[in-house]
Structures are given as C-alpha cells and as structure tokens.
C-alpha cells in the first residue's frame, strides 16, 4: 500500500491511498465466502460454489464493492498511522480508481489537529481575588443557615419585601379570561420576582383580604406579548420568624453543642469554599492566558458539530420545541441571531480548549491511576443524577470510557502546568499553586476541569 498526504489548510488534509490487489486477498476471500452463502447452485453444497460460478451469477461488481467496503476502514487507519496524522472527526472518502486485479485507489479528506505551540507556563503571571474570611462572611453564612430553620407566622400588617402571601390569581386579555394564568392558593415571596412582572409592586403595602389589579405583558403562553389585566386576591399573609443564634440553635442545626463551636466550624467551611473558588479562579485565569498566547486555526466542521451538539442539548431541555426556544430567547431579550452567534463563540471556545489540552497532555504525559478514573466516573454519574453502575454500563456499551480517561488526563496535565505559573492575589500576596494543584489535589481538579468542559 502507498499513501501520500496533501495539506489543504492548517486544519484539513487530503490522503491518497493506493492498494495493490495482491494485498486484498483476505478481503476477496471474505467477499466470495459471503456471496457463496447467498446462492444455491446444483451440485455444490451451500457456501462451496466456485468463484467462476459466483461471478457468472452475480457479476464481478458486487465482489469488488464488498472488497472495497471491507478494506476502507483498515487501509484508511493504516494511512493515518503511517503519516502520523492527528485526524479529527469522520473523513470524506471518494473511490477514485478500481482496476480489477490491479489496484484500488481512494482519497480521504479529513480535519486534522492544527499545529499548537504551548506557552512557557513559568512566564505566565496571573492575579486572583484574595481570600478573606471576616466576621461578615461568617455572619452571612450563619444567617443563611438560620433562614433554613425559620418558620412562617401569620400577620396582618402591610406587606413588605421578603414576606409571604397566598394568592388567587386571574388574568384577562381584552376581557377574555386567560386560563393558563388562573390559579388558586399560590404561595409567593414578595420581592422574588419569579412570577409575573408588576406583581411585587402591586403587593407591597397591601394587607390580608385585599385584592389588587395591575396590567402586565404576558411572557409566554397563547397570549405571549399581549397586555393583560391581572387580579391578585390576597388570602393569607405570613412573615418569616428566625430562631435565635444560641446554643439551642447550634444543637438543632448541627452536630455541635455550642454556638461558639458552630461559628468556628462555619468559619472553616467559608474558608474552604473561598479557597476552592480561588483555585478555580487560578485555573481559569491560567487557561485563559495560555490560550491567548497560543493562537491556532480551528477545524470548521468540528466547531459546527460542537455548536450543533450544544443546540441539540438545549432543545432537549425544551422537548425539542424550536418555538419554545424562541420564546425563551425573547423573554431574555435575545434574538435568535444573537443566540446563534453566542452559541458559535461558545463552540469555538470549547473546541479550542480541548485541542489545547490534548497537546498539553501529550507534552506533560501525566499518569492516570485506576482510582482517579473511577473517582471521575463516579463524580460524572453524580453530576448527571445517575446510578453509578447504570452509568458505567452505558459508558461500556457506548465505548465512552476512553473519553473520560482523556478528561482526567487533560485535567492532570493542566494542573501540572499550573504549578509552574506565577500567582498573586489582589492584595499582592504570592500564592504557591502547588498548594492547590500539587499531586494530592490533582484528581479533584481533574474532575472540576472535566465538568467545566461538558
């Protein structure tokens, strides 16, 4: 077999392959054996008919067609390997010559990974927000915990932001009742803004048993975009009652006996969360700087595939209803054109990041242990809300375990490179990235990096 490569662009090549017939004996034998099973010729057992009779019955064409179909995957793969081509995606194959008993020739155009020059990570400088755990941050966390143990108590004063009401809602457009906007016994927190535009303003200052009326533009449904008259009947009013921050609360809300112990534990939790955020900031800033210093062309077909995949995933969340997507975009003040542009930019970023990390992984050559791969699989299953055993079964069936292995390898490669970067916080303090991305922290960072790519 002979092969040659023509560079069509930075990201696409054309491979020409010539295969002499003497190399196709296994495929010829297999083709005749398959056809022999399809014909019954008097005097011969099934599958034992000689080739001359098969040619007479079917002609030589079906044999050659089967030979070509059988040999294409292996010969294409051989040409890719021999020419050290980093192919991406599926090739466009064309059979250019079939000379019986002489040669088969085909061409394959395929996208390839562009040449990527990695930066000197030791020359990269990044700055991230400083980690400051003050009393205010701890108080905020404790207030959040306190709110989770609050109770709702009836009241009859004028409504304020943050208080709760029970409503009977109805709406009409041009005097016609809007059924989908009619409900009873709806609980709502004033100020949340997650129901109907104008509702919060209408409720403020009202009391139990009051009825308010206001106009608003409906955001969805059959009357989307129409001006509607909304009537809200207030059937109950409640306010949040918070427990005191004392030892009794500490025992109720945690495993601690005293408020002092709970406060100290909360401070540790806040510090851990802020440090995790700082680690993520370091990773993001380093990756951003590295990508900016390593410009390279992107295979258009791969970007298109990524953009299509992103759109398909989003539509899947909307029952593949294109009209529903347009409605969501309109409610967000975004046009379809703006969405498609942003989707394309996101796809380019995703493809650029993965190609860069693939090259980085080949350079850094991190080792991935079975435990690290298992941890990542469990992490991914959890992020999808799936049973781990069921998820692993799906991975094995679809042959996707290698992809998750590559995810971990990319994450570890980036972690190794980050350890050479110069990092300071916003207060000018030097940060040793090994504290976050050293050997012990790499597996967890690999999970985070893989999750960000999905």
UniProtKB/Swiss-Prot annotation:
Domain of life according to the entry: Bacteria
Q: List, alphabetically, the Gene3D superfamilies matched.
A: 3.10.50.40, Trigger factor ribosome-binding domain (3.30.70.1050), Trigger factor, C-terminal domain (1.10.3120.10)
Q: What class of enzyme is it?
A: isomerase
Q: Which Pfam families match?
A: FKBP_C (PF00254), Trigger_C (PF05698), Trigger_N (PF05697)
Q: Care to name a GO molecular-function term for this sequence?
A: ribosome binding
Localization per record: Cytoplasm
NCBIfam families in the cross-refs: tig
Record-given protein name: Trigger factor
Q: Which organism is it from?
A: Corynebacterium efficiens (strain DSM 44549 / YS-314 / AJ 12310 / JCM 11189 / NBRC 100395)
